[in-house]
Amino acid sequence: MATYFVGDIQGCLDELLLLLDQVSFDKEKDQLWLTGDLVARGPKSLETLRFVKSLDKAAVTILGNHDLHLLAVSQGISRIKEKDKTASIFTAPDSEELLTWLRHQPLLATHAQHNIVMTHAGISPQWNIETATECAREIESVLVSDKWVWLLENMYENQPDLWQSDLTGINRYRYIINAFTRMRFCYPDGRLDMECKQPPQELSSDDKEKLIPWFDLKSRCPLSHTVIFGHWAALMGYENNGVIALDTGCVWGEYMTMYRVDDGQYFTQKAIS
């Protein structure tokens, strides 16, 4: 049995299938862990949802910002973004089944054997693994309750940007969602920056003083697990300091990256979509 982690798919199903062919993936004995954002700008978002769902227990996926946006669009809360290719999902005969399945996916998944946690964007620098897990479970419980539409209606804001354990209600939920699905840079005091998407090396000298990748923040809570995440395509992959970034911009014409945790080997597939 082998365990593979793969970066954001975003509807680039053909590249994912080629990666799985590279390693002779067998869903009867192997596992595929996906860092979220199954859908969005690639050509096969509908087919990607169907494929990952069909893997059943051979796949573990988590929610990314594009997945949550898809759910919001399904309820008329938001509109399909100009470059997204997700319209076919809403007219598919299995649309409701797929969207319900997606809504029941977690924000954080733990691989106990390999001491790994997987989230879409990372772990808030104020959280240890226990707090992160508790926060993820809070949001997951709302998403499967009758308050899930209310949650999606109120998630589209950047505040609060600093974690406090006494946050309550939608402010608490919004921070948790932003940290798990949108975070890239933080300010030195730990506040989340929700605007900058550049790679760290391209920041101006002034910005480098005030914008720090969440995983490089000196005051970051020590973590007991390796963190595997996607989301930040501009990093073009990263492994250091107890974190592994796997989104390498396939949907932007770069390539898709998969990591076999058992032996630390990486596999890549150039974008063809």
UniProtKB/Swiss-Prot annotation:
GO MF annotations, alphabetized: bis(5'-nucleosyl)-tetraphosphatase (symmetrical) activity
Cross-referenced Gene3D superfamilies: 3.60.21.10
First and last residue of the signal peptide: none
Entry keyword set: Hydrolase
EC number(s) stated in the UniProt entry for this protein: 3.6.1.41
The protein's enzyme class: hydrolase
Pfam families, sorted: Metallophos (PF00149)
InterPro entries: ApaH (IPR004617), Calcineurin-like_PHP_ApaH (IPR004843), Metallo-depent_PP-like (IPR029052)
Catalytic function, reaction form: P(1),P(4)-bis(5'-adenosyl) tetraphosphate + H2O = 2 ADP + 2 H(+)
Keyword Repressor: no
Protein name listed in UniProt: Bis(5'-nucleosyl)-tetraphosphatase, symmetrical
Organism: Aliivibrio salmonicida (strain LFI1238)
Organism classification: Bacteria, Pseudomonadati, Pseudomonadota, Gammaproteobacteria, Vibrionales
Gene expressing this chain: apaH
